[in-house]
Swiss-Prot record:
SUPFAM superfamilies: Ribosomal proteins S24e, L23 and L15e. One of its GO terms (cellular component) is ribosome. It comes from Pseudomonas paraeruginosa (strain DSM 24068 / PA7). NCBIfam families: PRK05738.1-3 (NF004359), PRK05738.2-4 (NF004363). Part of the 50S ribosomal subunit. Contacts protein L29, and trigger factor when it is bound to the ribosome. Keywords: Ribonucleoprotein, Ribosomal protein, RNA-binding, rRNA-binding. Gene3D superfamilies: 3.30.70.330. It comes from the Bacteria. The gene is rplW. This is Large ribosomal subunit protein uL23.
Length: 99
């Protein structure tokens, strides 16, 4: 997998209360990923970008909410979320892996 596709697959970390609890307790991390990305692509992208071993990848599609505005109804974009479980003994550090 080339470096350009790695950055198109992983859009960024998803920060929430649940994601923070999973990262602290179970060594699982949550990412926003491209909607056309497969589990194998996500696994390879995380392993190459952060130099860790991935145990499991679980994905889900999040449907965009319908919102009311002054101009009528609007819809937020659909997006895909990936839960990344690392092998025991592995840890993901966002600060040093970006270098």
């Amino acid at each position: 997998m080339n470096q350009e596709r790695v950055f198109k697959v992983l859009l960024g970390p998803h920060i929430s209360e649940k994601a923070t609890g999973l990262a602290d307790g179970k060594s699982q991390f949550v990412f926003k990923v491209a909607t056309d990305a497969t589990k194998l692509e996500i696994k390879k992208a995380v392993e190459s970008l952060f130099s860790v071993k991935v145990q499991r990848v679980t994905t889900l599609n999040v449907k965009g909410k319908t919102k009311r505005t002054a101009r009528g109804l609007g819809k937020r974009n659909d997006w895909k979320k990936a839960y990344i479980a690392l092998q025991p003994g592995q840890d993901l550090d966002f600060a040093t892996s970006a270098e």
